[in-house]
């Protein structure tokens, strides 16, 4: 009679964690950073259809790395959670902390009970009336939650890019300064002595603008993004508002 195969709980959890980390490492990094007028999100993403940065509720946004179908399901669940809570109670009762707790329960349950963990890492951010009131939560594949301040980097090169952000980011940067910094950080170190530059068309950028009265989320693209990346510090407004001729920046929500 053969003995049943046994795997210790410690080894099982380690294998699941390694599996999830490998899946996350294959994704391009996402940087979330505070600026003087709110919170900016940026990632290298040539796709126009598949977003890694999205609006959840009035002043709450979501960013993720990993398997698209898995974090897209989480995004949709987050939108439904926020809508239901806002409808049942009050819109002011919907906050990033509650959403992060809901995500943590889902991620933790899947990690411990399902056959495979979710290969995702997500950030839930909420812009407040002042920079002191901003909330940024980072959630890992196992449901662990970290309360971040200033900026956070996710993805395969998170440690290396996080070091670069630590050295160069500081409170009070304008949106233009933050986006130019993030693009340089995402490009990584020079290759063969030549720095790599990410085209603006390959960047997915959005902001939570604290000056907007209700829906703070705004995508930044087209001429507005070009101006922010090229202009000297402080010449473009922190909101990314369209100019008189119109721009490709979209107003709130996904397409």
UniProtKB/Swiss-Prot annotation:
Tell me which InterPro entries the record gives.
Answer: Ntn_hydrolases_N, Proteasome_alpha-type, Proteasome_asu_bac, Proteasome_sua/b
State the Gene Ontology terms under molecular function.
threonine-type endopeptidase activity
**What subcellular locations does the record give?**
Cytoplasm
Q: Where is this region: Disordered?
A: 228-255
UniProt feature, compositional bias: Low complexity: 232-255
Q: Does the keyword Cytoplasm apply?
A: yes
Which keywords describe this protein according to UniProt? Cytoplasm, Proteasome
A Gene Ontology cellular-component term:
proteasome core complex, alpha-subunit complex
Q: Which HAMAP family match?
A: Proteasome_A_B
**Which purpose does this protein serve, as stated in its record?**
Component of the proteasome core, a large protease complex with broad specificity involved in protein degradation.
Quaternary structure annotation from Swiss-Prot or TrEMBL: The 20S proteasome core is composed of 14 alpha and 14 beta subunits that assemble into four stacked heptameric rings, resulting in a barrel-shaped structure. The two inner rings, each composed of seven catalytic beta subunits, are sandwiched by two outer rings, each composed of seven alpha subunits. The catalytic chamber with the active sites is on the inside of the barrel. Has a gated structure, the ends of the cylinder being occluded by the N-termini of the alpha-subunits. Is capped by the proteasome-associated ATPase, ARC.
Name the record gives this protein: Proteasome subunit alpha
Q: Source gene?
A: prcA
């Amino acid at each position: 009679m053969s003995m049943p195969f046994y795997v210790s709980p410690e080894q099982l959890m380690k294998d699941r964690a390694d599996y999830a980390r490998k899946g996350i490492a294959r994704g391009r990094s996402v940087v979330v950073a505070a600026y003087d007028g709110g919170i900016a999100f940026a990632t290298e993403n040539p796709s126009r259809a598949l977003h890694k940065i999205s609006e959840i509720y009035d002043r709450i946004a979501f960013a993720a790395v990993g398997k698209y179908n898995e974090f897209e399901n989480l995004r949709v669940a987050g939108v439904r959670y926020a809508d239901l809570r806002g409808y049942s109670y009050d819109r002011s009762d919907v906050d990033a902390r509650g959403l992060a707790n809901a995500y943590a329960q889902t991620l933790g349950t899947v990690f411990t009970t399902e056959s495979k963990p979710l290969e995702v890492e997500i950030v839930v951010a909420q812009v407040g009336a002042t920079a002191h009131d901003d909330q940024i939560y980072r959630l890992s594949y196992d449901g662990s939650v970290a309360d971040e301040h200033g900026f956070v980097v996710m993805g395969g090169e998170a440690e290396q890019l996080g070091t670069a952000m630590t050295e160069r980011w500081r409170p009070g940067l304008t949106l233009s300064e933050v986006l130019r910094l993030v693009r340089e950080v995402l490009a990584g170190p020079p290759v063969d002595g030549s720095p790599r530059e990410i085209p603006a068309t390959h960047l997915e950028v959005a902001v939570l603008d604290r000056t907007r009265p209700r829906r703070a989320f705004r995508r930044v693209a087209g001429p507005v993004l070009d101006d922010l990346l090229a202009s000297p510090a402080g010449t473009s407004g922190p909101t990314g508002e369209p100019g008189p001729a119109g721009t490709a920046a979209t107003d709130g929500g996904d397409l």
